[in-house]
Amino acid sequence: MHPLRCVLQVQRLSAPFTSMCWVLLRTCRAQSSVSSTPCPSPEAKSSEAQKDFSSRLATGPTFQHFLRSASVPQEKPSSPEVEDPPPYLSGDELLGRQRKVYLETYGCQMNVNDTEIAWSILQKSGYLRTSNLQEADVILLVTCSIREKAEQTIWNRLHQLKVLKTKRPRSRVPLRIGILGCMAERLKGEILNREKMVDLLAGPDAYRDLPRLLAVVESGQQAANVLLSLDETYADIMPVQTSPSATSAFVSIMRGCDNMCSYCIVPFTRGRERSRPVASILDEVRKLSEQGLKEVTLLGQNVNSFRDNSEVQFNNAGSANLSRGFTTNYKPKQGGLRFSHLLDQVSRIDPEMRIRFTSPHPKDFPDEVLQLIRERHNICKQIHLPAQSGSSRVLDAMRRGYSREAYVALVHHVRETIPGVSLSSDFITGFCGETEDDHRQTVSLLREVQYNTGFLFAYSMRQKTRAYHRLKDDVPEEVKLRRLEELITVFREEASKANKTSVGCSQLVLVEGFSKRSTTDLCGRNDANLKVIFPDAEVEDITNPGLKVRAQPGDYVLVKITSASSQTLKGHILCRTTMKDSLTYCTT
């Protein structure tokens, strides 16, 4: 008997509740001498399949069905779902068993916030936190990749920790070292291959996975999760406030960035933009208010492009308005609750809580945002406008979406709309192809705008960026450093002039504590986010005439400014007050 010969025929079908799928149909042909039921012909099978498809299509959901489903708000679970542990790990293995974790943070304020998110997750799994490196069982470094210098700092730190790990007494549990954040995302392969003493890698979107990763590490393996997410915002995780005397807090409202500036690694290490639901942000701010905190900073890589699309009824709204003369590198986004709505709602929670936000993009300052900042007394009159360069040619190479002229026009518009506003900015010197004339234009922008605060850096090329693939890092390092020094000098001169306009004025200051340089001076920050130093003294409480008090962290006080530098104001305290009452007395 000849063996059976099988022929596989692939036919594409459609099921009513799924997308198109591939189905394998087995048809068999046997030798005519073999006694078997004959298979239908291909034509018959095709006709039968078409009839079956038509029947299922007629009884399946219609377009109206999907419209009705979309218009009905989905019931939200009372608590976030907790995924079952992988089958090879028991629930007990995911517990920290009171092992001590030491967390070390590098880079931006988002990393500081991420550190508290990671700690909140580990705390719930039974880990303890320690500030003593020597007693730690797990050391986690929350890292930054924005510049080469930041990464080199981490490599140097790992060499130091390697000594600590090799000298670990055998009587103690093995020391585990993990790299978290942007550097884990950018250099995952190099870290695991170059530094065998690193046990764990977790990218910015993988902190929920830390208990599992640590459990895998305990089995003697390296563990890594650096997957980027399109929707992870950690909205359900309340960061742990580790300082009991803290007067302010940062609230992350969105993650990632879609701007794709040619020099920037952020979209590749933190992924696409996604925003937290407004309701979860408001809930976190309310809790911080109840804890007595007096200042909240809304945080995001591109904070003012916030767009909450979680509520269906707001998804059909039009696209956002951009600052005049500004463009985007992406298609305009439609719908959602925008930053102006969030800022409005947050500022209404507690009239005695100051509201800030960082870091914005200049393109996302429509008039409704500026008007709101002007009208609300508890939204700080301080705006960060990252320029990056004063040369339109360089700005075009950076893919910033604006010219020098458009940027300067925005500065004038902001100052006209918000009298007395304080401005800060970011600048990069030595970008690809930057000439001496380009550099002089940046110097002239610093003099023209006269920022109160500035953050200036020499360009550091990052792999994966558009500049890495399409431009040449052709400005010598010594030239970059020389230009940076020139920018810093000019910035300090102009900032000192700008800040000296406050001398003689009375300003509202939120007390943070004693000055680091003197136990007799107090330190706080004004509306412009400038540090204000003033002698500790007994003063009157304006809300309770006749009562003499000494200012404490978290108090609002009026301070008369007597001197100013490029970074600090000095003065003497007048009284303790509230935000509302201070409106009568502040002269700036």
Curated annotation (Swiss-Prot):
Pfam family, one: UPF0004
Record-listed [4Fe-4S] cluster 1 binding positions: C108, C144, C182
One GO cellular component term: mitochondrial matrix
Tissues and organs where the protein is expressed, per its UniProt entry: Expressed in brain, liver, skeletal muscle and heart.
GO molecular function, a single term: 4 iron, 4 sulfur cluster binding
Catalyzed reactions: N(6)-dimethylallyladenosine(37) in tRNA + (sulfur carrier)-SH + AH2 + 2 S-adenosyl-L-methionine = 2-methylsulfanyl-N(6)-dimethylallyladenosine(37) in tRNA + (sulfur carrier)-H + 5'-deoxyadenosine + L-methionine + A + S-adenosyl-L-homocysteine + 2 H(+)
Keywords: 4Fe-4S, Iron, Iron-sulfur, Metal-binding, Mitochondrion, S-adenosyl-L-methionine, Transferase, Transit peptide, tRNA processing
Annotated GO biological process: mitochondrial tRNA modification; negative regulation of cyclin-dependent protein serine/threonine kinase activity; positive regulation of mitochondrial translation; positive regulation of translational fidelity; regulation of cyclin-dependent protein serine/threonine kinase activity
Function: Methylthiotransferase that catalyzes the conversion of N6-(dimethylallyl)adenosine (i(6)A) to 2-methylthio-N6-(dimethylallyl)adenosine (ms(2)i(6)A) at position 37 (adjacent to the 3'-end of the anticodon) of four mitochondrial DNA-encoded tRNAs (Ser(UCN), Phe, Tyr and Trp). Essential for efficient and highly accurate protein translation by the ribosome. Specifically inhibits CDK5 activation by CDK5R1. Essential for efficient mitochondrial protein synthesis and respiratory chain.
Protein name: Mitochondrial tRNA methylthiotransferase CDK5RAP1
Top-level taxonomy: Eukaryota, Metazoa, Chordata, Craniata, Vertebrata
